[in-house]
Design a protein with these regions (language model features):
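Short glycine-rich, Thr/Ser-proximal phosphate-binding strand/loop in the N-terminal lobe
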Residues: 14-51
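Short beta-strand-loop/turn "lid" adjacent to the catalytic site in phosphate-handling enzymes
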Residues: 66-78
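Short loop/turn motifs at secondary-structure junctions
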Residues: 10, 31, 72-75
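Conserved phosphate-binding catalytic cores of ATP/NTP-utilizing and phosphoryl-transfer enzymes
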Residues: 1
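Generic hydrophobic secondary-structure packing signal
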Residues: 53-56, 74
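Short glycine-aspartate micro-motif
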Residues: 4-8
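Short, well-ordered amphipathic alpha-helical segments that serve as non-catalytic structural scaffolds
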Residues: 56-67
Length: 78
């Protein structure tokens, strides 16, 4: 069995899905977390992310990293 984490960061939210992948190709999702980041609404006049947007994204990624550690993830795909 391999433990896989998939991270998707979109314009409105970030999601972490952790699954167990078995040798026969079957999988079992064991954790799913979604955080509303609203990045599309947090840009400055030059269309760059604000410092607050970057800070909240970093905090979310720290939370995701912690969960990956708890679930002893073998591989992360982002």
């Amino acid at each position: 069995m391999q433990r896989i984490a998939i991270i998707d960061i979109g314009s409105n939210s970030a999601r972490l899905v952790i699954s167990h992948i078995y040798k026969n190709g079957a999988y079992n999702m064991v954790y799913n977390q979604k955080e509303a980041l609203r990045l599309s609404q947090k840009v400055d006049s030059s269309n760059m992310l604000t410092e607050a947007a970057v800070a909240s994204t970093i905090e979310t990624m720290k939370s995701f990293a912690y969960m990956c550690k708890i679930y002893r993830v073998d591989k992360t795909i982002a």
